[in-house]
Amino acid sequence: NEGIAPETEAILSAAARAQLVEELIKPALYDHNIVVADRFMDSTIAYQGFGRGLDLMFLQELNYLCTGGLKPDLTLLLEITPLMAQKRKKKDKPDRLEKEGIDFQEKVRQGYLHLARENGERIKVISAGETREKVIKQAMQHINSLITERWGN
């Protein structure tokens, strides 16, 4: 739905996240597995909070409710300007959020960067403007550091 209200978008995202947490994430963590997700609670703050202008405190409480307080141990933020991202993706058809335009994407980007500044111990920023090899190397360094910190060599 292209004309979805920001509040509805936030609540639907939270509902999907709550289901994901209950069905997949909690059981995996209970079985001592490492869980990797491509988006999680920070996306709500960046997209609905910074992008759509919804109240950040409301969104934080919504995140807490739908995740049961679970937070990622590590978040890798692949940082790129909206213009560069758009140029890279020019072959693909834009999704609903990409159709919002550069101004919206920049608000979301600034939201993610704000979260990274506020949560530097958890959110690691990687320049996605670098080569694929450099991005992968940086990501693996952060992942390996966390594994070493938690479980040793």
Locate the predicted segments by residue.
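ATP-dependent small-molecule kinase phosphotransfer cores
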Residues: 1-67
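NTP-dependent small-molecule kinase module
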Residues: 83-153
